[in-house]
Amino acid sequence: MATWKNLDTLETFKALSEVKRVKLADVMSGAEGAERVKKYSVPMAEGFSYNFAAKQVDDEVLCALKALAEEAQLAEKFEELYNGAVINTGENRLVLHQLTRGQLGNAVEADGVDKREFYVKQQARIAEFANKVHNGEITNAAGEKFTTVVQIGIGGSDLGPRAMYLALENWAKKNNTLKMKAQFISNVDPDDAAAVLNAVDVAHALFVLVSKSGTTLETLTNESFVKEALKKAGLDASKHMIAVTSETSPLAKSDDYLAAFFMDDYIGGRFSSTSAVGGAVLSLAFGPDVFAQFLEGAAAEDKLSANKNVMENPEMLDALIGVYERNVLGYPGTAVLPYSQALSRFPAHLQQLDMESNGKSAVSYTHLRAHETCAALV
């Protein structure tokens, strides 16, 4: 089993700290710079690539980072994660979001259930429901098709699904796969819900309430606001709402919803876009086939993340460079600048993914980190 040690106790980190600094202005200029752009690129899944030519590294730094990864047993720790080890020691839980899109290692069982089978079953249920909505088997009270889907959630129940929807919306329009327009309500300020409700035809809107516990105050407050708006419009809210929650929540078997789809405690909210949290709204918006393709792409990238060769593992390489920038070069922040308008909400999603995960100063209840946590993403 891999062992966990503070970064500053590793011999390879000390060696990394002593490597000569790279001056980007020198290495990025002229023919040498052009060659560097070609050389410092790692293939990703689905035709993408991770280019780190503009990062303050060279071959000597990369060699030191590879040594750090080996001493820190990064690949081994990731392998333990996807094989079902208790990685979330604070809550004594497995970490299983990767199982929502594929299985990298052994079958993982928790609470007497094969978790990959559980997530696949929920995806199949969502696909069946979405298809029935699209073909008119499930309609509003007047027998008319729903034309808009509105997700009600907060934090990871909003940031990831919203970023994914906006990333795919124009592509879907161009490829005739936009089935329903999607909107999102997340702010507990009633102006947020009011603005969305004023922009949609509530008689033809289907609302997705997302709360793992079924008790999230902000989300339930917004649900009450929406229910009141539906009531004022003479509509039965139970015919316009579905829930995404856990099987043990008070929402799971409530008559207030057309259907309930399930997630569990082994998927953190910020990682939940490929679970039912993202699956319901994205399948309704674009169709189950598009969401399935999204999962396939995520699974393909997951496989690269398991590669023990750092130079063939873009996720591990980027993480290591981030450690170097924060703890050796001393950079306090990282700017995320999407040139694509479709990715306009990606920075907010990434902020939660990275900073909520890697910004914690406590390793456990009794152990504080002696090194810097992640940089602030802006």
Annotated model-derived regions:
Residues 6-141:
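Extended, charge-enriched "interface" segments that sit outside catalytic cores
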Residues 119-135, 164-165, 170-203:
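Glycine-rich oxoanion-binding loops at beta->alpha junctions
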Residues 148-150, 206, 335:
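Conserved beta-strand elements of the Class I
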Residues 149-163, 271-276:
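Conserved phosphate/anionic-ligand binding catalytic regions in large, soluble enzymes, centered on
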Residues 159-175, 199-201, 223-231, 255-261:
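A glycine- and small-aliphatic-rich helix-loop capping segment at beta-alpha/alpha-beta transitions
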Residues 160, 164, 193, 209-230, ...:
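Extended, hydrophobic alpha-helical segments in both membrane/secreted and soluble proteins
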